[in-house]
């Protein structure tokens, strides 16, 4: 959908000058050869250019060849091309199979190398003896991703749960887990992480915890595994455990987790938000009730990682009337996963004091949200959605915002 961000859309940065780097040695006949990587003179900006590169480049000369066949296919399938070039991609497989240096080189193919700088990628290259053979769970993982991609709206979580129950839950026993090969053990961990991220269900976190312990037993934990487990613990509000994990795995480059406190009784299932304590530098989130049944209000699903959300906030703040209406009747809310982005949320609130951003405690805080896209404006009358405005195009969306405000009698 144009002008919205789903998850983390990656928009490309500047092109670094081309260079030649040695490929991995190939001692097939007793001679080590340094093959020069084939790097295009300019970034690949279309599917046609990518197809030409793949056609004309021997696999051994391409950094794409550093990926296992399945990872390469998933990465290339994730590339989204826009009018002016590449507009989005998934870095999941790159994180789990390559180091930052390798990711940087590979992303130079597309002019997107800057995204490797702080990526939670491997700290050391996979050993040459690493078994790249696809196990039984890699195909199951592909089907899990397909279930997530093809599900409509609020059915995504259900589709993921069904796929996970059929193909991964049977492997979540100690005996089955121990019997898996290393790659399948990693895919089991990644599947549990995806299911927990999509649904927030505690059963998936329990699976993830056991899978992480299995990877520890095999001495297979590196930065991507520890980073994903850390973030899952924070989303599950286990800040003490996340803090302990950081101490055990300093390769996880995160700031200390905020303390999470609740000073009022909030019953299970009641909508609530995490709020950054204003006027203090304490790393603390406080949980408050969130009344979605107020007579008239605007709930804005936004993200600190979405420049469309920032543009919307800028344009609304530039209009004195809208700024005051949103200050009194608006609530900007980030998805539950942004509990991992404490510093970014605090910076947003300092930059937009009239449009302060809270973090949804869980999915129940925003029952009207079927699929996480940002920004989305929900105009509510006593909890009923009367109008919805999706996205923030280059020309803004202020007219649509005014129409929505009129429908809930906040603007004449």
Question: What does each model-found stretch correspond to?
Answer:
Residues 368-412:
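Non-catalytic, surface beta->alpha helical segment in thiol-disulfide oxidoreductase systems
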């Amino acid at each position: 959908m144009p002008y919205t961000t789903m998850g983390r859309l990656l928009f490309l940065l500047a092109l670094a000058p081309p260079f030649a780097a040695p490929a991995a040695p190939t001692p097939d006949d007793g001679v080590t050869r340094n093959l020069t990587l084939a790097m295009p003179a300019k970034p690949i900006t279309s599917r046609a250019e990518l197809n030409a590169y793949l056609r004309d480049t021997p696999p051994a000369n391409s950094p794409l060849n550093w990926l296992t066949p399945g990872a390469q296919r998933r990465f290339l399938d994730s590339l989204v091309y826009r009018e002016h070039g590449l507009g989005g991609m998934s870095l999941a497989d790159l994180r789990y199979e390559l180091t930052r240096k390798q990711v940087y080189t590979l992303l130079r193919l597309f002019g997107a190398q800057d995204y490797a700088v702080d990526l939670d990628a491997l700290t050391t290259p996979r050993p040459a003896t690493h078994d790249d053979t696809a196990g039984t769970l890699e195909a199951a993982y592909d089907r899990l991703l397909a279930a997530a991609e093809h599900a409509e709206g609020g059915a995504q979580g259900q589709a993921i749960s069904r796929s996970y129950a059929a193909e991964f839950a049977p492997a979540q026993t100690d005996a089955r887990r121990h019997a898996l090969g290393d790659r399948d053990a990693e895919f089991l961990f990644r599947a549990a992480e995806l299911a927990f991220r999509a649904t927030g269900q505690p059963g998936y976190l329990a699976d993830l915890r056991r899978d992480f312990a299995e990877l520890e037993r095999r001495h297979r934990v590196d930065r991507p595994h520890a980073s994903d487990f850390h973030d899952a613990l924070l989303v599950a509000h286990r800040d003490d455990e996340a803090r302990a994990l950081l101490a055990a795995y300093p390769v996880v480059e995160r700031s200390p987790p905020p303390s999470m406190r609740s000073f009022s009784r909030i019953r299970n299932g009641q909508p609530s938000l995490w709020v950054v304590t204003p006027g203090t530098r304490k790393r603390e989130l406080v949980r408050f009730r969130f009344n979605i049944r107020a007579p008239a209000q605007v709930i804005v699903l936004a993200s600190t990682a979405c420049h469309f959300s920032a543009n919307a906030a800028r344009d609304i703040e530039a209009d004195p009337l809208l700024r005051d209406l949103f200050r009194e009747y608006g609530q900007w809310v980030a998805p539950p996963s942004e509990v991992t982005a404490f510093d970014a949320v605090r910076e947003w609130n300092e930059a937009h004091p009239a449009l302060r951003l809270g973090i949804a405690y869980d999915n129940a805080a925003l029952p009207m949200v079927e699929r996480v896209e940002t920004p989305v404006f929900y105009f509510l009358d006593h909890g009923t959605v009367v109008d919805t405005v999706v996205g923030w195009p280059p020309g803004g969306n202020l007219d649509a915002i005014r129409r929505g405000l009129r429908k809930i009698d906040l603007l004449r």
